[in-house]
Amino acid sequence: MAEVEAALPVAATETPEVAAEGDAGAAEAKGPHKLQRQWTFWYDIQTKPKPGAAWGTSLKKGYTFDTVEEFWCLYDQIFRPSKLVGSADFHLFKAGVEPKWEDPECANGGKWTVISSRKTNLDTMWLETCMALIGEQFDESQEICGVVASVRQRQDKLSLWTKTASNEAVQVDIGKKWKEVIDYNDKMVYSFHDDSRSQKPSRGGRYTV
């Protein structure tokens, strides 16, 4: 949406060159704030699957963005977990990465998971995580795929997906940083996607922080 502003007179002591430089600086400040990479919102409204339907058929791609302004517009209008009802998920992943175990970026990875029993807590943790991701606040940002907010009847979950599950040192560093980001004091557990695929999850998770 274009903005219309009244033109301000240039001070008599300013040369046209100085005034032009000032105008250019102001225009740059008002322009969109670009992110280091593109990100994509996804959503998954889960209903009773049809017989023979493949997993992930309800997963839909939402919007891809690359500016701070676009993120806030999408978050405020649509992608807030408390707006979800029933069994549904919101995902924020790097553009080009699908929130599926089968995606090459996720295939050998895993996830840190936290539980939330209150929608307000989930909203806050989701927002803080999204801002940390798009703001590249993690030292191991190349290892992160994205985050998933899962709303369920009994309790909600937030999961941070990463690429290389076998690299314990990196995953532990990411887990510790994430706890700081969302101000989480309870134990956090990391599980391998391979364990979930085999339906034999490691008891208590592979790593904890």
Swiss-Prot record:
According to the redox status, the Cys-106-Cys-145 disulfide bridge may have a role in regulating protein function by affecting its ability to bind capped mRNA. GO terms for molecular function: RNA 7-methylguanosine cap binding; translation initiation factor activity. Pfam families: IF4E. It comes from the Eukaryota. PANTHER family: EUKARYOTIC TRANSLATION INITIATION FACTOR 4E RELATED, EUKARYOTIC TRANSLATION INITIATION FACTOR ISOFORM 4E-2. This is Eukaryotic translation initiation factor isoform 4E-2. It is found in: Cytoplasm; Nucleus. One of its GO terms (biological process) is regulation of translation. Component of the protein complex eIF4F, which is involved in the recognition of the mRNA cap, ATP-dependent unwinding of 5'-terminal secondary structure and recruitment of mRNA to the ribosome. Recognizes and binds the 7-methylguanosine-containing mRNA cap during an early step in the initiation of protein synthesis and facilitates ribosome binding by inducing the unwinding of the mRNAs secondary structures. Keywords: Cytoplasm, Disulfide bond, Initiation factor, Nucleus, Protein biosynthesis, RNA-binding, Translation regulation. One of its GO terms (cellular component) is eukaryotic translation initiation factor 4F complex. EIF4F is a multi-subunit complex, the composition of which varies with external and internal environmental conditions. It is composed of at least EIF4A, EIF4E and EIF4G. EIF4E is also known to interact with other partners. In higher plants two isoforms of EIF4F have been identified, named isoform EIF4F and isoform EIF(iso)4F. Isoform EIF4F has subunits p220 and p26, whereas isoform EIF(iso)4F has subunits p82 and p28. It comes from Triticum aestivum. Disulfide bonds join C106-C145. Residues 1-29 are annotated as: Disordered. MRNA binds at residues 51-56, 83, 101-102, 152-157, 197-200.
